[in-house]
Amino acid sequence: MTTNNPVCASDAHMEMYSSKLYTSALFLNLIIATTSMILTGFAIQKLFMESIINISTRMFLFCGLMCCSLHQTAYIVLRIQVIYQVFFKLSEPCNLYYPAIDCKYVTFSLVAGNTGMIFIQSAMTIDRIFATIFPKLWPKLKYWPGVVLSILMIACNYANVQIIFWGDPLTEYVPTCGQFPSKSVNRFQTFLAIALYMSIAHMVINVIILYINVLQDRQQSKSFNVNQRYQSREALKSSQAIFFLSMSQFFACLIYSVFTKVFLEFQLNLSPLQSGLVLALSYTTPYACIAIPSLIIFTFRFIKNQRLRNINELRSQTETGDECMRKIAKIWEK
């Protein structure tokens, strides 16, 4: 339940709503969010149309894109709300703020989108660990690792969001739905610190896995078993793709975590206009949600080209091996 007495916007907040620079930043946010949704659509099409990496990895990437879409959808709704305030409600300063309870789904979706991308990163890392430890067994499981780990991480993400907002009655009024409820801020900051350590762990583990896969590929490249060499190359390419995407997500999480912690720490020292402009121009997740689908599209194209080159190399190596065996047979017959 919210209080029956709405809060009127202060002169400082009215300055923010009236700022043409702030309004321009809002439209820029809309353009960025809309662009990311379009790129996400192309990336999802790539995931479904091209099977150049294993199905589990594609499932994780799909879940990551869904987290981006969840965040960006809420972000678009948020920005449209503020633009509506700017154009149609400036004459009603006591009717500008939103009850926090009415912003529940927008706020929860923004947080769930951010935290979901971190948990999906964990799922991809766990999958690569088992694929490296059990190189023969893991491919035979097909899509099951992706299904199980995706469900597990989605459940963890849902539980995490509930814990962050646990016991918060959401009774206050907020200038925009993007403003974090004051009673949940401490738990959210705690998760940001944990998420940063999680991302560092993901990076270290993926570097180790990539190194192991390179060694495995070098060993298998000497084998005459084409299937083993092909599986080894596939594992290496999947690890390279996940390492590349994990690296980008790591930096996105690092920047997001540091930015959010610093912003929450110094927010009270900023005027509403300064605070609004900082959030509108420096909030990193919308940019990350443009980068991730773009990187997926680029990575798929790169792997596809590499795969074609590798297949041609394997064919030429197989012919060379057969010729060698024929020569040995001729020598033996003599």
UniProtKB/Swiss-Prot annotation:
Compartment(s): Membrane
Single Gene Ontology MF annotation: transmembrane signaling receptor activity
GO cellular component: membrane
Pfam families: 7TM_GPCR_Sra (PF02117)
Keyword Ubl conjugation assigned: no
UniProt note on tissues of expression: Expressed in interneurons AIY and AVB in L1 larvae. In adults, strong expression is seen in AIY and AIA but only weak expression in AVB.
Family designation: Belongs to the nematode receptor-like protein sra family.
The protein, known as: Serpentine receptor class alpha-11
Native source species: Caenorhabditis elegans
Gene name, Swiss-Prot/TrEMBL: sra-11
